[in-house]
Amino acid sequence: MPRFLRLLLISAVIAAVATGGLVLWSLQAESSDFAFVPRAAAPTLGVVTIAGQAEPPKDAGAVYFSTVGVRHATVFETWFGVADGGELVPNHALLEPGESEADRARLDTVAMDSSQDAATVVGLRALGVPVTVKPEGVRIVGIEPKAPIASSGAELGDIIFNVDKQRVTTTDALRAALKTVGAERPVTLTLHHSGEMETITTRTIKGPKGTVMLGVVPSEATMILSPRKVTFTLQGVGGPSAGLAFALQIYSAGKGYANLHGLKVATTGTLSMEGTVGPIGGAGEKAIGAARVGADLFLVPMANVAEARAGAPKSVEVVGVKTFTDALRAIERATTS
């Protein structure tokens, strides 16, 4: 082959390899969208501990909480889908307009704390243990970007205790205190921020129908008082969807795990302090995670049953529940069927 043809061929090969490498690199680059990927459900034993609880007997059964791995999807995945039972989630479906990933992480931490409080109340009360829920302050779970408080140093998850030295423990008390201050007036807030008590100064804003607002979405922060102490040891997991699992662990530990009859019970679902189970995201991926640990039963919110069954292998029985009591009954039925 003439020398110039060899050089031309080599140049063509190099160009093809370089182009292919560039395309491959581009496809593996992160997109702005997210991927939900299945994770094996995790045991609640060791995560939730009740004072005085005994070690579960062998073959007693176990409760598992289901989680979903969340990461940025690659460009390839936005075109061709997420492998191994994963799901592509558009950016706008996970983040609100103007919300950063750091904001979402803080909200997920707040939601996890709230789920633990609800689980403690529901689980202990189901055991007949007295529980008192004491209002503590007003937690910030949303901030209007254009409101003065957005540039005051306050962050999502902060808890407001005082408005101009007036103690506030509920959202109603916050509204009353702000009404006293008046609209578009300076106001001093004492709040729990980054583990410390801090004082900041901001301005109120006019709300609808003559109301006075801070420009935040408030949620009541509470203190749980009970003679039976419950502790949680968990890192790297956020969100509200483990509430049902945590309550079941508290109840099962209190019953010596006899209520499980040897079953592996995986669960997902938000939980209110009244025992209502609410919907969650990623039910299909969580069903796969339940199967990975050999779960006999997968309890999900009623609103997520179809999605969970679509993702669950035949080896896992999926049951929808509306309340914590429903969950206990579902476990009992599974042991007698």
Language-model-derived ranges and their functions:
Residues R6-W25:
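Hydrophobic membrane-insertion alpha-helices, especially the h-region
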Residues D33-P57, S66-V70, N91-E144, T201-T267:
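PDZ/PDZ-like peptide-tail recognition elements
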Residues L124, I149, G157-I160, L189, ...:
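Terminal peptide-recognition signature
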Residues L127, R175-P218, A310-T336:
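PDZ-domain C-terminal substructure recognizer with occasional recognition of PDZ-binding tails
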Residues I149-A173, A177, A287, G294-F298:
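Conserved PDZ fold ligand-binding element
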Residues D164-Q166, S194, L271, M302-V305, ...:
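Short, ordered loop/turn segments at secondary-structure junctions
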Residues A253-A258, V265, L271-M302:
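Glycine- and Gly-Pro-enriched alpha-helical subdomains that act as flexible
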Residues L299-G311:
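Short, glycine/polar-rich helix-capping loops at beta-to-alpha or helix-loop-helix junctions
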